[in-house]
From Swiss-Prot:
Expressed by the venom gland. Residues 1-16 form the signal peptide. This is Weak neurotoxin OH-72. The lineage of its organism: Eukaryota, Metazoa, Chordata, Craniata, Vertebrata. Transmembrane segments: none annotated. CDD domains: TFP_snake_toxin. It comes from Ophiophagus hannah. It is found in: Secreted. Keywords: Acetylcholine receptor inhibiting toxin, Disulfide bond, Ion channel impairing toxin, Neurotoxin, Postsynaptic neurotoxin, Secreted, Signal, Toxin. InterPro entries: Snake_3FTx (IPR003571), Snake_toxin-like_sf (IPR045860), Snake_toxin_con_site (IPR018354), Toxin_cobra-type (IPR054131). GO terms for cellular component: extracellular region. Disulfide bonds join 19-40, 22-27, 33-58, 62-73, 74-79.
Length: 81
C-alpha cells in the first residue's frame, strides 16, 4: 500500500501549469494553462506614446517578441511576474 501511495505522489497525475495573465506591470491574476501549454511568458515594451506595455500568459512554446519587445519565458507556476 505504501508503494502505491508513493508512486501516485511521484507521478503528479494531471499537473497543469499556472501563469500570471494580465497587461499590467504588477500582476496578480492567475490563469490555469490548457493542456499542451507548458511555458509562462512575459513580454515588455516601452513605447513613446503609450508608455510601458506588458503581456503575460501561457504558451506551448516561448513566443517571439514583437518589434522592440523583450520576451522572457519560464516553466514553473506563476514564474512570469
Amino acid at each position: 500500500l505504501t508503494l502505491v501511495v508513493v508512486t501516485i505522489v511521484c507521478l503528479d497525475l494531471g499537473y497543469t501549469l499556472t501563469c500570471l495573465i494580465c497587461p499590467e506591470e504588477y500582476c496578480k491574476r492567475i490563469h490555469t494553462c490548457r493542456d499542451g501549454e507548458n511555458v509562462c511568458f512575459k513580454g515588455f515594451y516601452e513605447g513613446k506614446q503609450l508608455g510601458k506595455q506588458f503581456r503575460r500568459g501561457c504558451a506551448a512554446t516561448c513566443p517571439e517578441g514583437k518589434p522592440n519587445e523583450i520576451v522572457q519565458c519560464c516553466s514553473t507556476d506563476e514564474c512570469n511576474h
